[in-house]
């Protein structure tokens, strides 16, 4: 299932009573703040959900799968997410989660 910014705004509108414009502004402001924090290299902790952080990955050797030629993979920064214990427990105990669904993913 994919959840879009529009879906989140609609949920805010329905559950909290924001009008559509306010809900969209809140969602946009939230994601802008997340992006800005990550660009500055700051860690983002969302209690009960998890932690977003930046990690530096060094250059490493790679391989072209078609030719087998070795090529360097450049150093880069990547966003990582670590789920909180609460989120992990909720997912693991979810009755909607089946082993078939996990294997299919």
Swiss-Prot record:
Keywords: DNA recombination, DNA-binding, Transcription, Transcription regulation, Translation regulation
Keyword Transcription regulation assigned: yes
Keyword Cytoplasm: no
Disulfide-linked positions: none
Top-level taxon: Bacteria
GO molecular function: DNA binding; structural constituent of chromatin
GO cellular component, one term: cytosol
Gene Ontology biological process terms, A to Z: DNA recombination; positive regulation of metabolic process; regulation of DNA-templated transcription; regulation of translation
SMART domains found in the cross-reference section: BHL
Record PROSITE patterns: HISTONE_LIKE (PS00045)
Family (UniProt): Belongs to the bacterial histone-like protein family.
Subunit structure: Heterodimer of an alpha and a beta chain.
Function comment: This protein is one of the two subunits of integration host factor, a specific DNA-binding protein that functions in genetic recombination as well as in transcriptional and translational control.
Protein name: Integration host factor subunit alpha 1
Gene that encodes it: ihfA1
